[in-house]
From Swiss-Prot:
Keywords: Cytoplasm, Exonuclease, Hydrolase, Nuclease. Belongs to the XseB family. Heterooligomer composed of large and small subunits. It comes from Shouchella clausii (strain KSM-K16). Its EC number is 3.1.11.6. SUPFAM superfamilies: XseB-like. This is Exodeoxyribonuclease 7 small subunit.
């Protein structure tokens, strides 16, 4: 399996969703559940880092009158 940080965002999210689904089913032996949880935490961290990187890129792209404009993406998403 590819290292978590090397996975594209979409693939990491798919794997994370699959892990969560399996853990929620409750049919996983304890040791396997712990390993799956650790893998899920790694995937979650990787996705978070990728989102932060994209947010910084978007902040740099968004210009107004030639000036860099900070954008709060959460507020804009809710509008």
């Amino acid at each position: 399996m590819a290292e978590t940080k090397d996975l594209p965002f979409e693939e990491a999210m798919r794997q994370l969703e699959w892990l969560v689904e399996k853990l929620e089913e409750g049919n996983v032996p304890l040791e396997q559940a712990i390993d799956m949880f650790k893998e899920g935490m790694d995937l979650s961290q990787s996705c978070h880092e990728k989102l932060l990187k994209v947010e910084k890129q978007l902040d740099q792209i968004m210009h107004e009158d030639g000036e860099l404009v900070e954008a709060n993406l959460e507020e804009e998403a809710n509008e």
